[in-house]
């Protein structure tokens, strides 16, 4: 498995279909798993997810996981990481969506550079406008970069592909 995409689900029935379809419609799907973690959502989010996954006929492997009680976003991310088999991990929040070639471009860059972390540009969408965000990162050791990514120092979580070994070994 090359890429594990982790999607948290809690009270996102308005957004989760677009999010999941943006993963399903990626140009690179051959060695991708999508781990959806239900954090005891009170709405119909998981019914939407389950229908999309049941109807899906492609090569992405899906894992649907469920917490026994609501534990919060950090616990959801940890559950996803602990169940991930990919060399790289991408976190996609349920209200986010990806450009169709995002995984392909990021994975190619990771292979070309043997990167621990790949950052991508992204769009931020607001009610009245959209804003293009270009990513630049200073040279730091890989642990400091990982910490910065996880606390939002380098933008949103969706624009990063992080080597799984950074999580597991640190």
Question: What do the PLM-derived regions correspond to, one by one?
Answer:
Residues 1-170:
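Nucleotide-sugar donor-binding/catalytic module of glycosyltransferases
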């Amino acid at each position: 498995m090359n890429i594990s995409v982790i999607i948290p689900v809690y009270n996102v029935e308005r957004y989760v279909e677009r999010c999941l379809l943006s993963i399903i419609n990626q140009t690179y799907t051959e060695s991708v798993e999508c781990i959806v973690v239900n954090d005891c959502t009170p709405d119909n989010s998981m019914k939407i997810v389950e229908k999309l996954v049941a109807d899906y006929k492609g090569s992405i492997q899906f894992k649907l996981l469920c917490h026994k009680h609501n534990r919060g976003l950090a616990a959801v991310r940890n559950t996803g990481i602990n169940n991930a088999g990919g060399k790289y991990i991408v976190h996609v929040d349920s209200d986010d969506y990806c450009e169709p070639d995002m995984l392909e471009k990021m994975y190619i860059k990771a292979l070309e550079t043997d990167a621990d972390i790949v950052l991508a540009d992204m769009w931020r969408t607001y009610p009245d406008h959209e804003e293009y965000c270009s990513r630049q990162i200073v040279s730091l050791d890989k642990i400091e970069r990982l910490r910065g990514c996880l606390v939002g120092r380098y933008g949103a979580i969706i624009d990063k592909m992080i080597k799984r070994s950074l999580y597991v070994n640190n």
